[in-house]
């Protein structure tokens, strides 16, 4: 896939590892194409493992493997079904996240759960650091789960129904834009969740200023603005009150 400023085509880590071990690599442009489906059928897979794959797997492929298609999902299902479970876990201030290995069906992360592992979040957890934690935990869980699946030692568990509002929708660049009328706690979580991508930002003189780190502070032991006669806290949100070597102190909602 394209990497770097020059957008040069580079092999993915999965492809590099496969080639290092002499394993064949097949990279269809669209997995739903008849040619791709037939090529996978010829492989006669016992199991298909899907991790962060950006295409919908057709039913013809889901039904092929003896042990099914399994997905390594970066949340404790049914929480955070969808494309961006990691960022939303940080954004919502969760204390615990985790990985679920599930048997895939035609729904969006709705298949039966096979195994799970919990991963605690640090107070300064970012989207990037949690990604690394869950990647390591998921790889370990997958290696443990596959032999159990083959031996019939895994009992599939159906997922309870959840509201569609609980889905972890895809993150867009605009989700990094800071609304200073929100609370300091919400903004601090947003900044951590959006690191390293798409990154939190604000507008300064018409230009985007990326913000990588922040912490919540209480000025003068309380809400400074409630002590200023005639001060409107909402209108003053986003105003810089202190700028020194430690950074900027900005009023929030």
Predicted regions and their residues:
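An anion-binding loop in the catalytic cleft
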Residues: 181-253
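One-carbon transfer enzymes
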Residues: 1-198
């Amino acid at each position: 896939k394209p990497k770097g400023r020059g957008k040069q085509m580079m092999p993915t880590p999965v492809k590099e590892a496969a080639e290092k071990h002499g394993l064949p690599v097949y990279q269809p442009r669209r997995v739903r194409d008849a040619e791709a489906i037939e090529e996978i059928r010829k492989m006669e897979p016992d199991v298909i493992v899907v991790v962060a794959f950006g295409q919908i797997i057709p039913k013809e492929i889901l039904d092929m493997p003896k042990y099914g298609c399994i997905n390594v999902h970066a949340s404790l299902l049914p929480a955070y079904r969808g494309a961006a479970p990691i960022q939303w876990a940080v954004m919502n201030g969760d204390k615990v996240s985790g990985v679920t290995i599930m048997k895939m069906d035609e729904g969006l992360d709705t298949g039966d759960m096979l195994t799970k592992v919990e991963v605690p979040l640090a107070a300064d957890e970012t989207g990037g650091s949690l990604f690394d934690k869950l990647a390591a935990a998921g790889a370990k869980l997958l290696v443990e789960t596959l032999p159990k699946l083959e031996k019939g030692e895994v009992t599939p568990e159906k997922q309870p129904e959840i509201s569609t509002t609980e889905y972890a929708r895809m993150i867009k660049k605009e989700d990094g834009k800071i609304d200073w009328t929100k609370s300091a706690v919400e903004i601090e979580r947003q900044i951590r969740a959006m690191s390293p991508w798409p990154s939190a930002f604000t507008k300064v003189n018409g230009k985007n200023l990326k913000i990588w780190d922040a912490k919540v502070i209480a000025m003068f032991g309380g809400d400074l603005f409630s002590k200023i006669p005639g001060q409107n806290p909402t209108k003053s949100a986003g105003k810089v009150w202190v700028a020194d070597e430690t950074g900027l102190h900005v009023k929030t909602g």
